[in-house]
């Protein structure tokens, strides 16, 4: 809101922000848990085999970057509940306490339309839809849509698939679900 939004308004440029509502007002997405934990850890090595992840040396900045590159794809496609548990345990093992929120607040989301920014839904918990039962996806998407409509006091009819790779991150049944929920 302090850098891009004023420029978008000044030059009349359209923009859309897709919001995963479960992380507003203090949340942290799974990838931010991994990156932040590795960045802040006082350790030089992580023992992770019992989490079905490789043990990793993280004693230098380069090793930490490589660890992130190794871990993100391994954790990304875990079902949401497993992914969350792995991230929380991972942060504990890294001996970090990640309190700082990286996401917008509800008030910031509500302010976006004043800058000409469209707000779209992006699920509530940002699951990889293809890894979850369709009914879970429906509930998560509806929660996001309803939350945003409540905050903005207007219809939310745009949606972005988490990660967005057809066939890998979502399937045709998810496309049909999105349409049935009134998204364009």
Region roles according to the model:
Residues 1-158, 165-184:
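Catalytic alpha-helical scaffold of carbohydrate-active enzymes acting on polysaccharides/glycoconjugates
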